Amino acid sequence: MNKTYRVIFSAARGALMVVNELTSSVQKKGASAIVTAAALTLTSTALMAGTTLVADEGQNVDINIEVPDKNGHGVEANAGEIKTIGSEQSQITISATGKTGIAAYSEGYLTILGQNITLSSPNGKATQAAKGGQLTVGSEATEKTILSSKNEGVYASKENTSVKVNGKDIDITSSKSDGVFASSGANVTVGSENTSTLTIAGTTAICAQQTLNDKPSSVNVQADSIFLRKLFKNPRCQAGWNKNVLFGFS
């Protein structure tokens, strides 16, 4: 049996709460094993510290997160926080109108798991990691991963920072910036030997840069078929930058 959860705003609690689609109010204590165990509460800017939402074994959990805060992130792990959203059987949809759909900062660890993952950030970045943040989207079991945004689809900056995007079919699109961007020693990996099709589109599809005093950054992409689309010229990734873009084919 599938379970579907959605996020609503609770005026009484002044926070966004996860509720079962079959109920009209916030889940009560003990009403759902998964919510009770996960203790999931969302604020208008990010999931609370230590949040973990996983599926009961053998069941699917559909998670829809809508974050209207224009100054915040859809889901964030910061200052050493470790967060996992979903399971390999989940259907994940995250829509954030703020700065970033999902973010990991200052050695925060954020993992988004799902059979299918859709992340939309029409006003900002789809994903962002910085200052040692570790961000993982999808797993080897993920069928399709879609990242759609106005700014960078994948953004990583500073040493010891990494972003990994997995899925058998991956589509990353930025309407106004780089599809994938790495700088100042950060590392990005998109796809794996299990990825069939990878599409990246943006002002520059892929940009990895090194400024004068920084270590080199890298972007590694791997798939059976790779499609890169450059929407228009981006001066940030023209001659003068030290770029390190690595392509792999299974």
Question: Over which residues does each language-model region extend?
Answer:
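N-terminal Sec-pathway signal sequences of secreted and cell-surface proteins across taxa
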Residues: 38-43
